[in-house]
Amino acid sequence: MRWLATFVALLIAISSVSAAEVHIFVDKESVNLGDQIRFQVYFEVNRSADIAVVGDGGDGALLCHVDEGEDLYEKCGEEWVFRIPEDWQEGTYRLKVVIDDTEPEEHSEEFKVVKPKIKEFELKNLVYQSRTELEVLVESANPASLKLRLYGNNVDLYYEETADYEEESNVYSAKFDLNLREVYERTRDIADAVKPGKYILDLKLEYGGKVWDSRRVTVSVVKPEVAVSAPEKVKVGEPVVVSIDTNRVGDTEYDGILVVLEGNNFLLYKKAYLDENGKAKVQFETAGLREGKYAIYVRDTSKTSTLSISDLAKNYYDLPPDNSFSRIIQAEDDVLVKKELWIVGNGKESVKVILQPSKAEIFNGTTMSFKVLLNQSVELSSFEFVIFVSGNSVKIESVTLPDGFRLLDKTLYPDYLKISAYTTNKTKTGFLAEVKVAAQSPGESRLLIKNAGVYNGLGEFVDVTTSQADVVVKESRKEGNTANVSITLKENATGAENVTNNSVTATTPPAKASQQTPAPATPPVSMNVGEIDFTKVFMFTAGFLATYSAGRIMMRKLSARGGKR
């Protein structure tokens, strides 16, 4: 039984060593390079021991070594305030306590060492006269200072923020308010505004009086962009919703955009307020408004106008930015968009504006005329319409109005025609115009009528719908051949005597693509050169010359005789 007693005694001795309590305290879970961290270690073991800071990357330091029989607290104290060297690697570190025995006994506590750095920031283009929020994420064990500088083109702006909002462990955020308008607001002079162009943005991260990280990027300040969508036609009583889309993303609550609804002796204006995506909607009520043509003006003022919003809206809402007066009121940097709108009645007279023919096939190098008609005759006082050409196969060459109508406005391009006309005769007709197009390349094109307006003899607006015409241009044939032009009429139209509601096939010789020559007043004489008798021509000429010479000789003789008398 003696061996059993010895074994029990040994087991008790080993248990007493392994059961020794070791207490380790680290005052931070993470610490920046160059910062201090406090350690505390407590144990009572009569053996040699080491206390050390050890990193995964190999960096570390021995804090204390205790030999067997030495007292830990008398030799090394109760705690250590340790400054992490700035040249250490960042990563995971451990405070280790190793007690020597037959098998070394190890105790440890982990902490992280962090190198302060700019983790993330994203800055898209800045917009002229904008106010943008820039968020910067910083990796750091503690809040850190960020300094931002925007400079270039005689502009130098400074901003400073502290990244103190902890998004996650060791990640802090800071938000900069990049207000480009503040430069203009100092003097209220547009010459001092931050102009569109290229600028440099410097961003520095400071901690403990040292710059740990920096970024330098090129930033563009771009011109404002405004896109507007609105209905072309609404009924009286229905709201007009104007949708605005800008590139002022992030400029929340920007209110420098003026929206005006303008009509005959009518004007109403509102401000637009942008959301975080640079979009806004403005609604106008039409109850009580007269039927007719209206215009919507959307004006981004960039908040630099010298006039009040009401003065600008009432008197200069449609002033072009390139007008010389715009410079006086500091509106040359404005963006102006115009949309046309028709407000129509409910269940009243309506007509359809159509193109005849509605379908046609012509050869390249030829021309063709389309009539703009109403589907019924109306006593007219005025009308207007726009024709767009989609595709490159045909182009608009000319337009002719019916007798009795005078032009108010005319704009003609190869792919665009706008006509506004009036009459004092209040003629009842369904014929509005004749549009001549020329085929310029094989393919397909479409003529679309848009923004059409018709007023009856009383000056009242007539509800209008529109249509389109399709044209197919084929390869031109050799000169002398015939060109079959296939024409299809789909709508019942009035006002054109030579247009019928039937399928027509016209056979016409192709015209040269270069130009048309007016027909001569009298038909030319055709002659076959091979049929001329040159012998007769020669004899006639010889006889004429002989007779002419003899006559000259006789005249001279008679003159000489008369002189002798």
From Swiss-Prot:
The keyword Signal applies. Residues 494-525 are annotated as: Disordered. Keywords: Signal. Residues 505-519 have a biased composition (Low complexity). It comes from Archaeoglobus fulgidus (strain ATCC 49558 / DSM 4304 / JCM 9628 / NBRC 100126 / VC-16). This is Uncharacterized protein AF_0912. Residues 494-504 have a biased composition (Polar residues). Residues 1-19 form the signal peptide.
